[in-house]
């Protein structure tokens, strides 16, 4: 379906004509707004500044306001807000005063899912990639799903799209427990880790119970697809009173991977499924964590009747997601070039998975890493884990912590991380103060054949394109969306 082709609004929401998003440029908001636009609703939204995202929505017919003001809500039948927006926001305050409904983004997503065949992907890590893989395999199988993803699906050029089938594939966000709004027919749990613990009062058992509650939102005829390689997911499995299908490398998995082999960006493996012939597949992403993401996809696709041919095609043709081990291109250095990679990972487990993928696909190459921790609270809570995993790089440059609205926490900053990593004796990290231009610092450290990884969830997101366009790297080669050099 053409992305901006208009469909009919949902009859169940016939009283709603104009929907206003507060913070419409956010990654969790813009996708829902785009789907609603394509369903025929009037959409408006505000954000603190314009962006490529808001320009895209404007091109589809959304009315965009820069800044938050009470008058932006005129004509709105409902306001959609993210968890970062509170009642002190002038638009929210005005809506409440005028008795205009104010709903969390997850509740609006739940309404889109309510009358569709919903597939919700939850878990601390791997949600975006797994959701994207499912959408790609379903598309290869001719099912034309609607999808709402927390990252840019390279093949589609967007993080959301309205399909013609009843399938709706979306991420389920545990960071604020808003995934409890969703009532899908199929739910995935990739893993459960200690992150966003403030939402759960610092109680890991409460986090585990919330995931069980999420799975119990499934109907009795639904399906919970669970990765039992993760010890916490395995731990909650007996508590889930819904039909389940398990996946992983474990021998007791319902869907299992064997014979994994990695060759650069390509990963090859064989899938074993109960009462099925073995299936040989490949995916254009490195690392065992992406094998697990692929297994979740294969489990759901098999259960939904997608053919093996479409599964193989959808996985092998997958072009990746923005900032998930995204190969940006090559930087010229003396004697050759350096592969430039950008990645969103910001939890020690995600960092470890990416480093493992680099070692598996390019065992003879050095890893030069520029890393930016995200949030002081996360750095504090997972400090020792960060020290251990970041010490595995060959060369490490640490940018200062991206605060994401938090106040500094004593001891939980990048200068202290550098000191702790240095004490391990494996490498001597370089501390980067805020505002320092990276290209002149990075270039002397690079050797031909290196892999340069820019990783983190903060404003490091703009570093890879800046390096690619830096006058210090004249002749840099840009990669296509498939990670191939143009």
UniProtKB/Swiss-Prot annotation:
Q: Does the keyword Cell wall biogenesis/degradation apply?
A: yes
Query: In which pathway does this enzyme or protein participate?
Result: Cell wall biogenesis; peptidoglycan biosynthesis
Q: What is its EC number?
A: 6.3.2.8
Its recorded reaction(s) are: UDP-N-acetyl-alpha-D-muramate + L-alanine + ATP = UDP-N-acetyl-alpha-D-muramoyl-L-alanine + ADP + phosphate + H(+)
The protein's matches in InterPro entries, at most eight in alphabetical order, are given as: Mur-like_cat_sf, Mur_ligase_C, Mur_ligase_C_dom_sf, Mur_ligase_cen, Mur_ligase_N, MurCDEF_pg_biosynth, UDP-N-AcMur_Ala_ligase_MurC
Gene Ontology CC: one annotated term: cytoplasm
Keyword Cell cycle among UniProt keywords: yes
Q: What are the GO BP annotations of this UniProt entry?
A: cell division; cell wall organization; peptidoglycan biosynthetic process; regulation of cell shape
Q: Which UniProt keywords apply?
A: ATP-binding, Cell cycle, Cell division, Cell shape, Cell wall biogenesis/degradation, Cytoplasm, Ligase, Nucleotide-binding, Peptidoglycan synthesis
Offer one Pfam family short name for this entry.
Answer: Mur_ligase_C
Q: Where in the cell is it found?
A: Cytoplasm
What residues does ATP bind to?
123-129
Q: Name one GO molecular function term.
A: UDP-N-acetylmuramate-L-alanine ligase activity
Q: What class of enzyme is it?
A: ligase
PANTHER family, A to Z? UDP-N-ACETYLMURAMATE--L-ALANINE LIGASE, UDP-N-ACETYLMURAMATE--L-ALANINE LIGASE-RELATED
Which family is it part of?
Answer: Belongs to the MurCDEF family.
Q: What does this protein do?
A: Cell wall formation.
Tell me what this protein is called.
UDP-N-acetylmuramate--L-alanine ligase
**What does the organism's lineage look like at the top?**
Bacteria, Pseudomonadati, Pseudomonadota, Gammaproteobacteria, Pseudomonadales
């Amino acid at each position: 379906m053409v992305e901006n082709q208009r469909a009919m609004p949902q009859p169940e929401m016939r009283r709603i004509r104009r929907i206003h998003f507060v913070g419409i440029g956010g990654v969790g908001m813009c996708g829902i707004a785009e789907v609603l636009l394509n369903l025929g609703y009037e959409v408006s939204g505000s954000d603190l500044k314009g962006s490529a995202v808001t320009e895209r929505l404007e091109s589809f017919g959304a009315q965009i306001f820069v800044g938050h003001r009470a008058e932006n809500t005129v004509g709105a039948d409902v306001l959609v807000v993210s968890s970062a927006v509170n009642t002190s926001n002038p638009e929210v305050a005005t809506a409440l005063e005028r008795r205009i409904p104010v709903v969390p983004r997850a509740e609006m997503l739940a309404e889109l899912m309510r009358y569709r065949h919903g597939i919700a992907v939850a878990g601390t890590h791997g949600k975006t990639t797994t959701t994207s893989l499912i959408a790609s395999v379903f598309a290869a199988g001719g099912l034309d799903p609607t999808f709402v993803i927390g990252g840019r699906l390279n093949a589609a050029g967007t993080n959301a799209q309205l399909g013609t089938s009843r399938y709706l594939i979306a991420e389920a966000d545990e960071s604020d427990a808003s995934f409890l709004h969703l009532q899908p027919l199929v739910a995935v749990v990739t893993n459960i880790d200690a992150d966003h613990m403030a939402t759960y009062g610092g109680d890991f058992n409460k986090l585990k119970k919330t995931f069980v509650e999420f799975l119990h939102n499934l109907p009795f005829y639904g399906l919970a697809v669970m990765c039992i390689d993760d010890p916490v997911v395995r731990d909650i499995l007996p508590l889930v009173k819904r039909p389940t299908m398990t996946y992983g490398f474990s021998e007791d998995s319902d869907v299992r991977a064997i014979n994994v082999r990695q060759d650069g960006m390509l990963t090859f493996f064989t899938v074993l499924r109960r009462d099925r012939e073995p299936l040989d597949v490949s995916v254009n992403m490195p690392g065992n964590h992406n094998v697990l993401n692929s297994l979740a996809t294969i489990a759901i696709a098999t259960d939904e009747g997608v053919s093996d041919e479409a599964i193989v095609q959808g996985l092998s043709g997958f072009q990746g997601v923005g900032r998930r081990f995204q190969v940006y291109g090559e930087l010229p250095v003396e004697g050759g070039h350096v592969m430039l990679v950008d990645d969103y990972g910001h939890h020690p487990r995600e960092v470890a998975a990416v480093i493992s993928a680099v070692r598996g696909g390019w065992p003879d190459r050095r890893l030069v890493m520029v890393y930016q921790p995200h949030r002081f609270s996360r750095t504090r809570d997972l400090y020792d884990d960060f020290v251990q995993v970041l010490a595995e790089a060959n060369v490490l440059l640490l940018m200062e912590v991206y605060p994401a609205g938090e106040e500094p926490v004593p001891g939980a900053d990048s200068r202290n991380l550098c000191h702790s990593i240095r004490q391990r004796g494996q490498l001597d990290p370089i501390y980067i103060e805020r505002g320092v231009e990276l290209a002149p610092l990075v270039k002397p450290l690079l050797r031909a054949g290196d892999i340069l990884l820019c990783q983190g969830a903060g404003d490091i997101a703009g570093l890879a394109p800046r390096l690619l366009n830096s006058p210090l790297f004249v002749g840099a080669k840009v990669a296509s969306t498939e990670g191939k050099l143009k």
